[in-house]
């Protein structure tokens, strides 16, 4: 609420006074409450000394509240009266009168505060009655009045009487208010005030309007005794409507003093329409006291009334004869057109009715087949994005892709079908290629939702849930392709124009709509195979429903997809996975490696898995021993250990890497029982009856793959784990010396020492010796990782420099002449350092993260 702090009679300072004077000059017509300057207000009574002074509407009791305060006034009476100022001007003033209550609170009454608030401008004016003496009880009720608030016509005010001191904020109010409305200058009492007289309240323009002819109108009025411009407004209406059909404004310049109270006239040119005859004339003065808000005087001129004595001539007297002929011709044409239209509509409706009742197909609302042209089907391509939750679910995805290819003629991009390409180009490159190809060819991306998709989506969002690492993703060479695909897909879901590229589906029976991530709630979700027909129309970019027709693919409607062999296989795969879910309700938690606590799932029952994809440890194990060269009189003996309990097949293929022209040699295979062959032994040449020797004898006693590196007429060491159930230390043909026998450990240490000596002496690599160490017991997956690691890293068994293949044993001995020997203490220190570097290299290899390499002991880390 705005607070007015000063008025013309109260000037706190010269700067504020000049500011108020400037505001009064800039806005002379602004209405605001003020105090009457004459006579001075008096509040003293018999038995009371009182003084009236201007107030800022902020009493000290608000800042320093008191405990005891007086009660509110008893009654308030407000009257409007007219008073004269010191200059003789008549102004409207408010007469405020109130009485006190007859209680003990008058003993604490220190005064009263009167305030007037102008409601339209929110300006407030306050005065304060300050009691200089204490009130005493007497026989009459104390009564006070104040008649010095000057108000303006047509304004609304709120008058408040507040006893002092004011109460505390939570105390009972001790004030009363009343609202009063001041009439405008049309009131008989207010018309005589100076403000109303200056705004023309006593001016009677005596407006007269005269119609000169049908096109001109003259307005006369009397001027007022002020040199001010006038404006005459004319607005015309029709006799039956309130909408203006014509308006015009005329200006009259300010008259001279001798022209005051004289008549002025202005002429208007009317509208050309004779029906625009109802006129409304207004005269607006621009007096200095009111400017644009001065009272307008108006007069209305109705349309002229046609006299009954004036009989108009018949219209027929003015119409020529040819008009009658034209009207008759138009009437005949209209009637003929209506007749022809009725005949045509009748004929058309009868023909349509015959067609409708003559064809049974049309009775059912189906158009003839000959009249419909089915939309053309084009070969399309889709990319299937899924999460490998379980081997059975992967089988369902494969069967679904097979159904799309065989039954629907749709090309499918699936990671399981392009593992070789993914291994060549990488996961992200393959995913980005598929995404770009789908966008450029306007193809579709099918997203198959399952429990794994929901879990991986929550992992992408960073929810406080366990991490997701599914067992099938761990088996796949490419790993988790769903997360990589989602990272490529996410930006498209910020653009609504890209929503049509994606088709979100889930297999009903093994998945539910709860498995669909929240990201896809803005798109349609299709349960398979219930709504596969709609999915197929999405793939073809065709509308299934059109005005008056509905398209169907008979082979895909309902359960008709079971008529095709691929559809039946898909159904069987879904039922097989559904049965597995029923037997193992916690199958997903057990498939998640992060929740399985390192325990493997039990092997799946053969009754459930009739045709497993790649069960753990299953399949055909292919082992390729590397044969460098055989002499003409030598042969290679491959010994395969067959265990009666094993039901798998193992294939051992020798792969020859000749360095020069090969000579004829003999290859002999022998099958020995596993219990007759030791776990690890030094292989001795086997002399055959024809005199040739065997290169090596390798017993297959483990489920893993072994790749012995056989040298020319040399014995190889086969190192196995100490416990047959333990995994090897690493996936490369090297092991910690702790698991080697005494001879093998000495041979390995001699190899390290030889390498170190050759590096110190700067001899060529061709002079290095050729002892080799071969490990057995690596799984097929670890062997694949080993081959890739060997090709990329280069530091394992193949990183050991090998002498040229064409050197004989005597030439190698000549090249391997010993260098200057070192002291035993230096050799021991170098040997420990080489062993420490060897084990550190094993730990740094990225392909050994899942294994537990042996760390060097503190004594080995700090050689003496």
From Swiss-Prot:
Keywords: Adaptive immunity, Cell membrane, Disulfide bond, Glycoprotein, Host-virus interaction, Immunity, Inflammatory response, Innate immunity, Membrane, Phosphoprotein, Receptor, Signal, Transmembrane, Transmembrane helix. The chain crosses the membrane at residues 323-343. Residues 787-800 have a biased composition (Polar residues). Residues 778-824 are annotated as: Disordered. Disulfide bonds join 43-50, 57-126, 185-196, 245-276, 277-303, 290-294. Residues 1-31 form the signal peptide. Disruption phenotype: Mutant mice are susceptibile to S.aureus cutaneous infection. Mutant mice are susceptible to A.fumigatus pulmonary infection characterized by excessive mucus production, goblet cell hyperplasia and exacerbated T-helper 2 allergic inflammation. Receptor for IL17A and IL17F, major effector cytokines of innate and adaptive immune system involved in antimicrobial host defense and maintenance of tissue integrity. Receptor for IL17A. Receptor for IL17F. Binds to IL17A with higher affinity than to IL17F. Binds IL17A and IL17F homodimers as part of a heterodimeric complex with IL17RC. Also binds heterodimers formed by IL17A and IL17F as part of a heterodimeric complex with IL17RC. This is Interleukin-17 receptor A. It comes from Mus musculus (Mouse). The gene is Il17ra.
């Amino acid at each position: 609420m705005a607070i007015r702090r000063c008025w013309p009679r109260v000037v706190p300072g010269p700067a504020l006074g000049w500011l108020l004077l400037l505001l009064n000059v800039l806005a002379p017509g602004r209405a605001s409450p003020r105090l009457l300057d004459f006579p001075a207000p008096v509040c003293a009574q018999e038995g009371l000394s009182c003084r009236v002074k201007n107030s800022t509407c902020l009493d000290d009791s608000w800042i320093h509240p008191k405990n005891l305060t007086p009660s509110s006034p008893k009654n308030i009476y407000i009257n409007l009266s007219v008073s004269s100022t010191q200059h003789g001007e008549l102004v409207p003033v408010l007469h405020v009168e109130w009485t006190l209550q007859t209680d003990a609170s008058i003993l604490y009454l220190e005064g009263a505060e009167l305030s007037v608030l102008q409601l339209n401008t929110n300006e407030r004016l306050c005065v304060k009655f300050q009691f200089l003496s204490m009130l005493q009880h007497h026989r009459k009720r104390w009564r006070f009045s104040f008649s010095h608030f000057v108000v303006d016509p047509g304004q609304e005010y709120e008058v408040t009487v507040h006893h002092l001191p004011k109460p505390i904020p939570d105390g009972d109010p001790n004030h009363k208010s009343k609202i009063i409305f001041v009439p405008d200058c049309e009131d008989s009492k207010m018309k005589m005030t100076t403000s109303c007289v200056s705004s023309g309240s006593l001016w009677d323009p005596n407006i007269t309007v005269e119609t000169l002819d049908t096109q001109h109108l003259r307005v006369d009025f009397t001027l007022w005794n002020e040199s001010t411009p006038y404006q005459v407004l004319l607005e015309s209406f029709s006799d039956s409507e309130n909408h203006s059909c014509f308006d015009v404004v005329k200006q009259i310049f300010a008259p001279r003093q001798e022209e005051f109270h004289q008549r002025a006239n202005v002429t208007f040119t009317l509208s050309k329409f004779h029906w625009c005859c109802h006129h409304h004339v207004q005269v607006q003065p621009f007096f200095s006291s009111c400017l644009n808000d001065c009272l307008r005087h108006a007069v209305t001129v109705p349309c002229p009334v046609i006299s009954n004595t004036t009989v108009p001539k018949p219209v027929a007297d003015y119409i020529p004869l040819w008009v009658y002929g034209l009207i008759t011709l138009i009437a005949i044409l209209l009637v003929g057109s209506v007749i022809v239209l009725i005949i045509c509509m009748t004929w058309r409706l009868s023909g349509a009715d015959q067609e409708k009742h003559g064809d049974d197909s049309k009775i059912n609302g189906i158009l003839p087949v000959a009249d419909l042209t089915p939309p053309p089907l084009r070969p399309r391509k889709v990319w299937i994005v899924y999460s490998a939750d379980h081997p059975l679910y992967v089988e369902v995805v494969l069967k679904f892709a097979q159904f799309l290819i065989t039954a629907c003629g749709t090309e499918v991009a699936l990671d399981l079908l392009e593992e070789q390409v993914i291994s060549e180009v990488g996961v992200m490159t393959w995913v980005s290629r598929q995404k770009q190809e789908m966008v450029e060819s306007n193809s579709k991306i099918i997203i198959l939702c399952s429990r794994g998709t929901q879990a991986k989506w929550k992992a992408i969002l960073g929810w406080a849930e366990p991490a997701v690492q599914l067992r099938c993703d761990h088996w796949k060479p490419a790993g988790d392709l769903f997360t990589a695909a989602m990272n490529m897909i996410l930006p498209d879901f910020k653009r609504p124009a890209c929503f049509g590229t994606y088709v979100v589906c889930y297999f009903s029976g093994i998945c539910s709509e709860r498995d669909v991530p929240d990201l896809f709630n803005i798109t349609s979700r299709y349960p398979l195979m219930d709504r596969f027909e709609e999915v197929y129309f999405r793939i073809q970019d065709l509308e299934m429903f059109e005005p008056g027709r509905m398209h169907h693919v008979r082979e895909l409607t309902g359960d008709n997809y079971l008529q095709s062999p691929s559809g039946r296989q898909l159904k069987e795969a879904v039922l097989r996975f559904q049965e597995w879910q029923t037997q193992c309700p916690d199958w997903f938690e057990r498939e998640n490696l992060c929740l399985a606590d390192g325990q493997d799932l039990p092997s799946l029952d053969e009754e459930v898995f009739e045709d497993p994809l790649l069960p753990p440890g299953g399949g055909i194990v292919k082992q390729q021993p590397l044969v460098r060269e055989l002499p003409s009189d030598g042969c290679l003996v491959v010994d395969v250990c067959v265990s009666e309990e094993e039901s798998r097949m193992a294939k051992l293929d020798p792969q020859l890497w000749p360095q020069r022209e090969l000579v004829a040699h003999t290859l002999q295979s022998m099958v020995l029982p596993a219990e007759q062959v030791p776990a690890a032994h030094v292989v001795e040449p086997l002399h055959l009856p024809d005199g040739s020797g065997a290169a090596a004898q390798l017993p297959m006693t483990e489920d893993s793959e072994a790749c012995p590196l056989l040298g020319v007429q040399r014995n190889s060491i086969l190192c196995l784990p100490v416990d047959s159930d333990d995994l090897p230390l690493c996936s490369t043909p090297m092991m910690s010396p702790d698991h080697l026998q005494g001879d093998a450990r000495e041979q390995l240490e001699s190899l390290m020492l030889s390498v170190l000596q050759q590096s110190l002496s700067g001899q060529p690599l061709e002079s290095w010796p050729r002892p080799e160490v071969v490990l057995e017991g690596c799984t097929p997956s670890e062997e694949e990782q080993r081959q890739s690691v060997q090709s990329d890293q280069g530091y394992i068994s193949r990183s050991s420099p090998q002498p040229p293949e064409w050197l004989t044993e005597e030439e190698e001995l000549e090249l391997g002449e010993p260098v200057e020997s070192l002291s035993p203490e230096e050799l021991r220190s170098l040997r420990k350092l080489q062993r420490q570097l060897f084990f550190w290299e094993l730990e740094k290899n990225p392909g050994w993260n899942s294994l537990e390499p042996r760390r060097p002991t503190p004594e080995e880390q700090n050689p003496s």
